[in-house]
Amino acid sequence: MMQVLLVTICLAVFPYQGSSIILESGNVNDYEVVYPQKVTALPKGAVQQAEQKYEDAMQYEFEVNGQPVVLHLEKNKDLFSEDYSETHYSPDGKEITTNPPIEDHCYYHGRIQNDAHSTASISACNGLKGHFKLRGETYLIEPLKIPDSEAHAVYKYENIEKEDDAPKMCGVTQTNWESDEPIKEASQLVATSDQQRYYDHFRYIKYFIVVDHRMVEKYNGNLRTIRRRIYQLVNILNEIYLPWNIRAPLVGIEFWNQRDLINVTSSAPYTLDLFGKWRASDLLNRKIHDYTHLLTAIVFVEQILGMAHIATMCHSELSVGLVQDYMPSEHVVAAIMVHEMGHNLGISHDEKYCNCGADSCIMYPQISIPPPVYFSNCSWEQYQNFLTIYKPDCTLIRPSRTDIVSPPVCGNDILEQGEECDCGSPEKCQDPCCDAASCKLHSWIECEFGECCDQCRFKPAGTECRGIRSECDLPEYCTGQSVDCPIDHFHRNGKPCLNNNGAEKGEFQHTGGRY
């Protein structure tokens, strides 16, 4: 039975409340102080697990602006893949890879009771650190560095003093795909039941992060500090993508603690190109994953905070992005990470007519304070079009689960250890491949998802699975024995196409996007 931790936080007026203070997020000119007092209350029949340091579920009661709130938190059990690893280098350049224990981690998602639009992302490693959204406003909480004190500061983003007022951009100049025609055609189609199921299925982006040498130096070589920062960044990223049924478990971190393995320069396009080539030729040979970010402390020219390719998720060389560790605030840097990953998922910058119900949306070309947490209606349509046209099926492969603390619960719509599938209760299950009563796949199925899969069976041989996308392209057809569409074929080099220009390489050119 899941444990529930009840912590009562008593709000006290701090003597220096309202004065400026230096916190991890920067200089804060207005804040409240809270003193968390932990009270543990186990449900009847529950047993305390001595080996578990951080509970699966926690609940906090406290006040904000004199109003009582109840914060519910649940451990993010999709934060890591089971084969999570870390790599750093010895002084002589030797690669050292370890598999740290990550089952009993301290990173949570949550919500405010009686606030349907609330969200929260909290680290409970050393006190409470993170953010929560309450009645449309975002608050941050972090421990105050006072010896022998449980004092925490609660404050708003607008109370963080800005060090630089210059607008920080996603330096993208053109985010459309090679041709807008397939997008327009796709957006005019009514999704079939199979397509809608393909859209709605959980996506798992196996996520890898590389930390460049400048960032290691920025944190004085303290890999433990960088590691915890990255864990919270990825926790926030997952919180933002969860409404889209996207999860991004962290499969690994590589620290370039001795030197950079590529030439990281202030030119974002140049660095992105080198990083993609290195990933394809080196990193993918050592670690299977879907997507890689280079987290850097370099300052890119033209106020650029990040850059990524467009519509390239699952591509060996182009499924990458750059992110500058721009501010102490983890939420701001996480918003840049979400934005750049969005480009790889086929999403362009928002136009003025796009709407997400907030002042600023994730794919707005400039970063805003407080950072955005919602995608716009335009982003959702572009993402669905990307799934329809490019079919990034690497994101359908489920990573190994790390949840070894709680037993699986069949029917909760969460795939857990020992389950082959979990589509919810028998009344709500919409997956024809899954037996909702047993959470096992039906014995007769041949496939679940894929370009050549229909209603859990292979599509007949000869069924077109990839149409012609340019004059140089050729159609591909299902074999009747596999879910995969055959490799993309093109006219031989030299055959006149594309306005009589010779076919060359046979690859779509993807436009780079900069945040």
From Swiss-Prot:
SMART domains noted in UniProt: DISIN
Residue ranges constituting the Disintegrin domain according to the UniProt record: 407-493
Gene Ontology BP terms: proteolysis
Keyword Lipoprotein attached: no
Gene Ontology MF terms: metal ion binding; metalloendopeptidase activity; toxin activity
Entry's localization field: Secreted
Positions annotated with a glycan in the UniProt record: 263, 377
Primary enzyme class: hydrolase
InterPro entries per the UniProt record, alphabetical: Disintegrin_CS (IPR018358), Disintegrin_dom (IPR001762), Disintegrin_dom_sf (IPR036436), MetalloPept_cat_dom_sf (IPR024079), Peptidase_M12B (IPR001590), Peptidase_M12B_N (IPR002870), Reprolysin_adamalysin (IPR034027)
E.C. number: 3.4.24.-
Cofactor descriptive note: Binds 1 zinc ion per subunit.
Catalytic residues (UniProt): 340
Listed Pfam families: Disintegrin, Pep_M12B_propep, Reprolysin
Motif (D/ECD-tripeptide): 471-473
Cofactor(s) listed in the protein's UniProt record: Zn(2+)
Domain spans labelled Peptidase M12B: 203-399
Similarity comment text for this entry: Belongs to the venom metalloproteinase (M12B) family. P-II subfamily.
Further details from the record: The disintegrin domain belongs to the long disintegrin subfamily.
Function of the protein: Snake venom zinc metalloprotease that possesses hemorrhagic activity and degrades alpha chain of fibrinogen (FGA). May inhibit alpha-2/beta-1 integrin (ITGA2/ITGB1).
Protein's UniProt name: Zinc metalloproteinase-disintegrin BA-5A
Lineage of the species this protein comes from: Eukaryota, Metazoa, Chordata, Craniata, Vertebrata
